[in-house]
């Protein structure tokens, strides 16, 4: 046997031995939880042992409720419009062991949903042994996996909703609620239509996308790292604060005193046609520009690092105050 052949043989033998050692170590380190599905091996992003290790609730009618409390660690929450006048719930959740990952109680008009320690994430890795390739498939949650779905009648209004999601998204077709409190530590908020009296939302790391928002009393929004987009807004008193991200509010009207503060990012506000001249407006951009082209009233003052625009409409008029520390401010009016 020549020298090259011996080298190849010795290398192959060493690699095979290393593979056996690593496989054995992996087995006792948790690899025994791997399951074969369709000639593939599957590993959940948590410690779930199988795709089949799920707890499933098919769409089922639940008691009516006017108060909603949610406390999730990894799950998403999706609120959809019911096809009738009844309330429903469904979910398909991965389990970590035998414990049900969700506990819920619907009593006296109050629905409480809590994620237990038995839940797991929805990201997974698949090893395709058939073609000897490995790939990480960080998928979107398909078929509502690890998502709790609630169905609420179209005209139903909640009196209170308190939602806290640590690592999950919140989405809703429509949500009518008198007092809404929401905290997302790492996740996005997606809302087609929201009508509230009081709206208090905190997003640490995620985007907010709302198609239509109405807040008749007070709105408080704090965003740490993410963009805020509202396509249509009717707002009264409130404050919007962004640490790092852009904000865009289109087709908007302000009926109270609204303050917008951005530490790092651009602010773009489109007001309804003809409403700017009837609003007390103060815009200040530090290390940025203020663009109010197209507005017939108000005055602009530009200094070395600061741009200011101001319009005075009277003491009884609503107020819009926007300050931006590192970014531009754009204020326009919609077309007629």
Regions found by a protein language model. Name each.
Residues 107-119, 284-295:
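Conserved long hydrophobic alpha-helices within structured protein cores
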Residues 122-141, 294-312:
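Acidic/polar low-complexity surface segments
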Residues 1-7:
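Positively charged n-region of N-terminal signal peptides that target proteins for export
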Residues 9-26:
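Hydrophobic membrane-insertion alpha-helices, especially the h-region
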Residues 192-194, 199, 208-223, 227-336:
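Short, surface-exposed interaction patches in beta-rich subdomains
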Residues 26-116, 122-123, 141-164, 169-183, ...:
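Short linear S-[DN]-x-LW-Φ motif typified by the pepsin-like aspartic protease active-site region
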Residues 180-184, 199-202:
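Loop-centered beta-sheet repeat module
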């Amino acid at each position: 046997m020549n020298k090259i052949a011996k080298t190849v043989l010795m290398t192959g033998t060493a690699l095979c031995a290393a593979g056996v050692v690593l496989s054995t170590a992996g087995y006792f380190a948790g690899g025994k939880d791997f399951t074969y599905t369709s000639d593939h091996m599957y590993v959940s992003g948590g410690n779930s042992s199988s795709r089949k290790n799920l707890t499933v609730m098919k769409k089922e009618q639940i008691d009516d409720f006017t108060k909603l409390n949610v406390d999730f660690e990894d799950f998403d929450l999706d609120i959809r419009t019911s096809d009738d006048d009844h309330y429903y719930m469904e979910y398909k959740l991965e389990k970590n062991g035998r414990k049900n990952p969700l506990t819920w109680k619907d009593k006296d008009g109050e629905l409480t949903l809590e994620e237990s320690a038995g839940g797991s994430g929805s990201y997974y890795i698949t090893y395709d042994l058939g073609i000897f390739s490995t790939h990480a498939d960080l998928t979107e949650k398909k078929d509502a996996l690890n998502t709790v779905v609630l169905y609420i009648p179209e005209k139903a209004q909640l009196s209170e909703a308190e939602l806290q999601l640590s690592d999950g998204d919140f989405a809703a077709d429509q949500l009518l609620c008198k007092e809404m409190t929401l905290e997302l530590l790492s996740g996005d908020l997606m809302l087609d239509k929201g009508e509230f009296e009081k709206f208090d939302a905190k997003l640490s790391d995620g985007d907010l996308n709302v198609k239509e928002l109405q807040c008749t009393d007070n709105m408080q929004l704090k965003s740490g790292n993410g963009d805020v987009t509202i396509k249509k807004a009717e707002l009264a008193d409130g404050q919007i604060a962004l640490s790092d991200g852009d904000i865009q509010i289109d087709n908007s009207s302000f009926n109270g005193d609204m303050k917008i503060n951005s530490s790092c990012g651009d602010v773009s506000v489109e007001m309804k046609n003809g409403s700017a001249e009837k609003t007390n407006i103060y815009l200040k951009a530090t290390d940025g520009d203020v663009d109010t082209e197209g507005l017939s009233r108000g005055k602009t003052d530009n200094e070395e690092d600061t741009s200011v625009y101001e319009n005075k409409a009277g003491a009884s008029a609503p107020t819009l105050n926007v300050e931006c520390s590192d970014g531009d401010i754009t204020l326009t009016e919609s077309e007629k």
